Amino acid sequence: VKEANPLKAWLEFNNYQSPVVGAEQGFITLAHQNLLGFGDTLSLQYGRSAGVNPMLNFKYEIPVGPRDTTVALQYRRFDFGVEESPFDSLDIKNKAQIFGLSVRHPVIRKADQELAFSLTGEHARNESTLGGNPFELITGAPNGRFRVTSLRFGQEYAQRSAEQVISLLSRFSVGVGAMGATANGDPNLPDARFFSWLGEAQWIRQLPLWRTQLVSRGVVQLSNDHLFPLEQIAVGGRYSVRGYREFTLIRDNAAMLSIEARVPVYTTKAGVDSVFLAPFFDMGHGWQTTAQTPGSLPKTLVSVCAGVIWNFWRGSHFELYYGKQLKRYDTDRNNLQDHGIH
């Protein structure tokens, strides 16, 4: 039996970034699934766009004990400058860093189902400048800086069969006043002391008609306080509501639903479906916790249309989606995303 190569590498290019910082982005990811020989994994991702450099994501995970418990260290960094007119001449820069430590333990682990719990501690730092000087780009961030320290309790459940996959994710987050976390007493300003809940459900079902695969996903986030952007949720873009530009809405709370049918239209000689037509319906609604917050008006985004998915050589993947806005969100920009293309 030939042992699988533990070293993996892959490239990715898409336009899933905000046009404000350059929509088109590229990534390279390197991963080793048995770095020191005891099942530990290391992954490193580097990416950039016209205005973002670098996007870094480093994660090292080690198994602990005989019951598949894992401990992970993670570091993420996201530096960007505004590239879209008319603000590109202002030299607006932002740097965000997130440090994380997590423990994950599966209490049920079978071939057809899994239930796991996780506990994560994170510390985030963000700073903004205008022309090289500290600048309050985000209201409530004195001298352009804010810090958020949070504890997160996660629950994951997955059930698999030959016909379907059901996965549920729940995460409670608490912002604590530690490690210099930014506190604002005004309820209309973001606060690092908060409580929020994020829930996600996904259902993938194999239908008998034309071997169609139905993919549905729902996401909800609720918060008791106005949040800093690193804790908020985005509505609009490839993975929320297609047909709108990425980060059309950034809100404390949101509810999103996506339903997509993947119909095979080309099968290889080996009998593998490789090209799919994917009609979809997306909807998202976002709102702020406090009504007086700037940009607080609730907004609903709705779109329909279709995409093409092509799985080709050795796991390579290509997809192109066009989304038609059913609720118009006016923009005078001329990016591909503004024309519904992802």
Q: Residue ranges of each PLM-predicted region?
A:
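Repeated loop/turn-to-beta-strand initiation elements of outer-membrane beta-barrel proteins
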Residues: 7-9, 36-42, 66-72, 80-81, ...
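Residue-level signature of outer-membrane beta-barrel architecture
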Residues: 32-34, 62-64, 105-107, 157-159, ...
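Transmembrane beta-barrel strands of outer-membrane/channel proteins
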Residues: 11-15, 28, 42-48, 73-79, ...
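Outer-membrane beta-barrel translocator/channel fold
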Residues: 75-99, 105-106, 129-131, 324-339
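Transmembrane beta-barrel architecture of outer-membrane proteins
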Residues: 25, 53-55, 96-100, 148-152, ...
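C-terminal outer-membrane beta-barrel translocator/porin domains of Gram-negative envelope proteins
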Residues: 19, 127-275, 279-283, 287-289, ...
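Outer-membrane beta-barrel "beta-signal"
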Residues: 30, 308-310, 336-342
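Outer-membrane beta-barrel initiation region
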Residues: 1-72, 109
